[in-house]
Structure formats: structure tokens, C-alpha cells
Amino acid sequence: MSAPPKRFGLIVKQKEEPKRAPVRVSSVFGDDDDDEAPATATNTSSASVIRIQKAAEREHQKAEAEDPTIFDYDGNYDEIQAIKNEKKEEARKADKNKESKYAEAIIKAHARRQLEQFSREERQQIKEREKEAGEFDDKEVFVTGAYRKQQEEVKKYREQEAEEAAFNDMTSVQKQKMWEMGMGRTLLNDLARDPTAIKQRKMEKKNVRKREDSGDEEEQKEDVKKKEEPKKKSIYDTDSEDDEKKSKAPEAPKKNFEGELKAGLNLVTKKATTHAERIRQRNFTPTPPSSDDEAPKPAPRAVGDHRRSTSPRRSRDHAQRNQREKTKSKSPEPPKAQKTSLKDKLKPKRIDKAARLDGLKAILAQRNTEKDIEEARQRYFERREQGLVVPPL
């Protein structure tokens, strides 16, 4: 136990609280059993736990009634261990030679590599003999039994290798049409072509079907908008606003009174003037005719309009430009080519059967008959007899 920490100064002794005695639960009949432990809050169990324990005890009793040695683990341990030892002994007897698990496969692979090396060396020796070109043909050749055995093994290895190559060639994926078709389709969908191209084509077809009903309505609307848009005036245009007013067509006369025109004299009924209008008329003083104010005021200059000198050259160019514009307006516009709508383009072309039949008859009429062929043949023989046709030699 660790020593209590040291404290310095005035130490006041604290009063220890008295320990409380455990609370005992009185029995039903007022008598306490000494054999049983006192029931405290820690060892009290609920009714459900007691019920489970009682059920387990009943199961144990049933099992013991069927087999008295069912819970005798120490007595059964020797039997269990004896069964395990018997199984190990059987496995040991079956594996008398104690063959390795992977050694046999490794030995076979080593023998195969040796045969490959012998085959390689033999091909190399054959090439060297071909280069010698019979230089050592007069010498004796010694062949041992081991060499013959080695040659036989190499021959078997080559035959086995040829069979494997033929089998692999026959079962190759490249020669399987089904796999080839699937691989080609995958390449087309994933590599050679954008995978979203099919979706885009479907969306375009849907849009075309929607526009079939509308026809050329959108194109007609665009043409009308272009015609209705006023021509923008350029800052370099020399035409004044007076010329524009003169070029405009005269407007129809307007009535200055309400109602319809009748036969005879139509009197204009004047409206009664208000008090403010009468005051304005009374205060109005007309200017004399000799006043400079009556002189025509120049029209307000438009934004971006530049004043230019009126030279004879400029006026001549202006007159020529006006003349060209008048001739253009008088000349009839060439007829516009009819626009074929998208709906007409998508419709299948109609084939005139009568015209097609006439064309076929004209083609067949140009063919030679047997009589024409015989006549041409006779003419050829006549020209050859006369020496006009020289046969090729």
C-alpha cells in the first residue's frame, strides 16, 4: 500500500461516519434461516432469470436420464484422444513413401527445360554442319546409346509440342466467330466510336419528328422578321432628313372632325374653349411678318450626323447614287428558289413507274438481235477477204 501523502500545517481530524449494517429482509413467517445467505440488492434475481435456470436444469436432468455419462468429460477424454491417434496412424501408414507435394512437378518442369535446351543445341549443330558443306563427311561418326535415347526424348518432346500448338491454334479465340463478333462490337462501341453518338442520333430523330408537323413555319417567320426590320442608318450616309421625308409616300388626308361625310355642306362643330385656353389666347402676341423668326429653322441634326461641304463633285456622286437606287427599286426582283422543307427531305422519293418503264424499253431497244449479229458477222468476213481487216499475229 502506498503511504498517505504528507500534509503540513494545522490538520483537523475529520469525524468518521459510522458504518451502516446490512439491511435484512424478514421472512414471511418471521423466522430467519441461518443456512441461506441474506438477500441483498446485488444477488436479487428477476423471475425471468429464475425461469430460464429452472428450464436448463430440467433439460440436464432429461439428458442424464438418457445417458448417465453425458457430462463425464474426464472419463470420455481418453476415448476421444484414442480416436484421434488412430486417424493419425492411418494417415502415416498410407504415406509410406513420404512423397513431397511439389517436388514431382518441379522435376518434370526441369526435365522439360532440359529437352528444350537439347532441341535448341541440335538445331544449332544442324546449321553449323550446313555451313561446313561436307567438309567432314569422310570422318567416322560415333553414336552412343545415351545420345540415341536423348534424340528419342527430343523427338517425343517435339511431337508433344506440335500437338499442343495445334490444339491451341484450334481453340484460339481469334478463330471463334462468336467471340470475334462480340469483340468487334465492343471495339466499335467503346473505342472506334463515341458511346454517346447513338444517344445523340436518337435525340436528333426525335427532334426531326417533332419538327415534321411544323414544316417551314419557322423559316417563314424568320423571313418576315428580316423584311420588317428597318434598315439601320449609317453615320457616313449623306442623305438628310428632308430627302427621307420627300422620298416617303404621301399620307392619306385625315378628317379634323368626328362623324361621317354627308352630302352637302359638312359643318365642323368647334369645342367650347376652357378658361385656361382663353387666357392663353388673350396673352398671345403675334410677331410681325418682317421678323427673322419666321425664317425656316434648320432641322435638328441627328446623333452621329456629320456636316460636309456641298461641293459639285459630292453633289454629283450623290445624284448618281440616288439614280442607282431608283433603278434597283424599279427592276423586278428575281424569283426566289423554293426552299425544300425538312419534312419533304425525309419523305421517300416517289418513283414514276411509267417513266421508268419507258427508260427500260429505250435501253432494251438498243440491244442487237440475232439477225443484227449475223449481218455484222458477214460484213466482218467480207472486209477480211478484201484485206481491210488484218488479223493480229
Swiss-Prot record:
* One GO biological process term: regulation of alternative mRNA splicing, via spliceosome
Q: Which InterPro entries match?
A: Nsrp1, NSRP1_N
Keywords linked to the UniProt accession? Coiled coil
Disulphide-bonded residues: none
Protein name (database record) = Nuclear speckle splicing regulatory protein 1 homolog
Q: Which residues form a coiled coil?
A: 76-166
Q: Where is the composition biased (Low complexity)?
A: 39-48
| Bias type Basic residues, positions | 199-209
Organism lineage: Eukaryota, Metazoa, Ecdysozoa, Nematoda, Chromadorea
> Basic and acidic residues bias: where?
222-236, 243-261, 317-333, 341-350
Top-rank taxon of the source lineage equals: Eukaryota
Which residue stretches belong to region Disordered? Answer: 1-49, 187-350
| Short name of any one Pfam family annotated for the protein | NSRP1_N
Q: Which family does it belong to?
A: Belongs to the NSRP1 family.
